[in-house]
């Protein structure tokens, strides 16, 4: 028996700690926690319409907000889940959101009505597959052009940049949609598209899913939970009040954006740490990899080495090839990183900090959906070029609230979100264009590195 903070009343039943829950994280022993209750969904794994991979990603965790945000169009999943209830969760691995407002409920109802009224499927449209076909075509054509069509050094340097940009588009369109299961209703589609990400980039799709879906999307800008924030007390940049400021942070607004170009080093090595070394991606535990995941990981690494080094060596000298490779990797890393950073690390956005991994993590006295509005900004609405070249990350607010809806529909949903925000007196952060979004990011880095009062501002709270 224990007291529920949410209901302020005594609840009886079998209790499980988060560490006990974490042990049940395989296909044959799959538990999850949702809204304080624990469910043994092992029998549901092979029956899940969204495929077993999504459930195995969630296995052994509290997935309350993941469950809510991935089932916005129907209440049926909630009724099905009740059949598998076995007890209650008594402790939490990461901070939990203890507030529930009417904001998200109202918003989901409006979005449902929109899709019903317009007779659209949020995961199926001709535009989805034509867009993905285009980015596949671009990445393979530019790969060929950059590696096998010219011996001119300067032309090849230019082609390396073009290939890197197309590689970024491939990641922000195909990989991003796949990791959120936002493409079609057939799990095999995003499963194999995810595997193609390993093949093309040499980075692990499964590792990215843990960092992005399980970590960043649920604990956006929550330090020691969101893997996208620096976890160490000493880091190359300071973006949260709990980090230690060093002398070099005074210049972080200059050097940090440049260092984003080496993000691909982390991109392609963190999966080794996650799968082999310590089984974690930042603060996020990595689920047990299936045989398919292991095969994709190994084949992806081998194909990356073969197609980026071994095969092109027949056409270029080693030194020239390394030069082209470094140029492409820098542009690829910078373009990906800056697109994600401007959406969350910027002026006027909130950061939530927690103590250093206590046995019972802090509660966040905030509604999860409202936190997404406080930690996220959009930019460049109305620009088709901005939308395409950002993979619709310029509509980041809608994406965080409805990650399982394909990005093609984001512009349609913006007016709905803005309307509900206005009704609930919630600020919708948006910049007019990409340039101003970048400047907001750089200004934030400058203030965190130079203004003592700025870094000492109180942490975000319910009343902010």
Curated annotation (Swiss-Prot):
InterPro entries: Cyt_B5-like_heme/steroid-bd (IPR001199), Cyt_B5-like_heme/steroid_sf (IPR036400), FA_desaturase_dom (IPR005804), Fatty_acid_desaturase (IPR012171)
Chief location of this protein within or outside the cell: membrane
UniProt motif Histidine box-2: location: 212-217
EC id: 1.14.19.-
Residues at which heme binds: 48, 71
Purpose of the protein: Specific for desaturation of the 5 position in C16 and C18 fatty acids.
Recorded family membership: Belongs to the fatty acid desaturase type 1 family.
Name of the protein in its database record: Delta(5) fatty acid desaturase A
Record organism: Dictyostelium discoideum
Gene for this chain: fadA
